[in-house]
Amino acid sequence: MENAKQSFHDVLEFVRLFRRKNKLQREIHDNEKKIRDNQKRVLLLDNLSEYIKPGMSIEAIQEIIASMRSDYEDRVDEYIIKVADLSKERRDLSKKLKTLGEVKG
């Protein structure tokens, strides 16, 4: 009976880890998309600032664009760090799942 309880607990743990691994993969994909989107925004702002000249508009617009660009770059950096953290956790879970699978096999 105790062995059956342990087996059931092991199966539940395996399912929990597998679901977490899948969730991490989805989060990684979502964050990679956010990275791409924000990199595109940075490029857009670069192009925009090439067209805006001091004689054509107020210099404050240049400052706003620079500030927006910096914000987007910061977001890209944050998402890159988050993806790295999620990837590490996913790799750790993969190793643990493999170990649990080998114990049963």
From Swiss-Prot:
GO cellular component: cytosol
Pfam family, one: DUF496
Keywords: Coiled coil, Cytoplasm
Cell compartment(s), UniProt: Cytoplasm
InterPro entries: DUF496, UPF0265
Coiled coil feature spans: 21-41, 67-102
Function in brief: Pole-localizer protein involved in the regulation of several cellular processes.
PANTHER family: UPF0265 PROTEIN YEEX
NCBIfam families in the cross-refs: PRK05423.1, PTS_reg_TmaR
HAMAP family linked: Pole_loc_TmaR (MF_00683)
Similarity remark: Belongs to the pole-localizer TmaR family.
Name of this protein: Pole-localizer protein TmaR
